Amino acid sequence: MLDVLTSLFGPYPLADYGALVIDARLGYALETQTLALFDRQISLSSSTDIFQVHELAHQWFGNSVTARLWRDIWLNEGFATYAESLWHERTDASFDIDASMRSLARRTFAPIRDPGPDAMFTRSVYDRGALALHALRIDVGDETFFAIVRTWVAERARSNGSTEELIALASRLAGRDIGPLVERWLSADPMPALTR
């Protein structure tokens, strides 16, 4: 798992990583820096790998590079959620990431540009954030998309970043203004359609 994510995002950004399973019913996992916390129910779930990938991805997106402001929380959760699909794409030959994202895009998600405290950790922030990243990947192509991701992680390591700073980086590496695309995916109501 670590090998796959480092191939996508760049070197693991911290000194250590571990996981702790507790005998409690939390109903969620938590990505504390260098140590993910899972409850027993999640650890025994058939989708435990998805939880593990999500929390491991947070070591890059959330722990090493964190959202500058709470309104940018989609950067942490969108990247970690998209990592779940990237993991499947790399480890399951039958997985079609475009079909999966199209299926997800058929659902209704509220705008996430500034979700506010009551909606900060809703599915909209996680899933629409992942869809925004997939739309960016479609638009700029794999080579540029993963260059954006790796550069974001490298330049922002042990720091923070904002949506505007990600847009500026993506625009620089793509050689054109990516802002309108990203802003549509974060703010438009209804949400845009995926192009592939």
Predicted ranges, named:
Residues 71-140, 150, 156-157, 183-188, ...:
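Acidic/His/Gly-enriched intrinsically disordered linker/tail segments
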Residues 26, 38, 111-114, 145-148:
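A short alpha-helix capping/helix-coil boundary motif
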Residues 41, 155-158:
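Histidine kinase transmitter module recognition
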Residues 10, 90-96, 137-145, 171-179:
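Structural helix-adjacent loops and short alpha-helical linkers that scaffold large soluble proteins
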Residues 57-60, 110-111, 143, 158-196:
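Non-catalytic accessory/interaction domains
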Residues 1-59, 63-72:
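Juxtacatalytic substrate-recognition/specificity segment
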Residues 41, 45, 63, 115, ...:
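Short hydrophobic/aromatic segments of transmembrane alpha-helices and their interfaces
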Residues 4, 33, 47, 51, ...:
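Extracytoplasmic/secreted proteins, especially bacterial periplasmic and envelope-associated proteins
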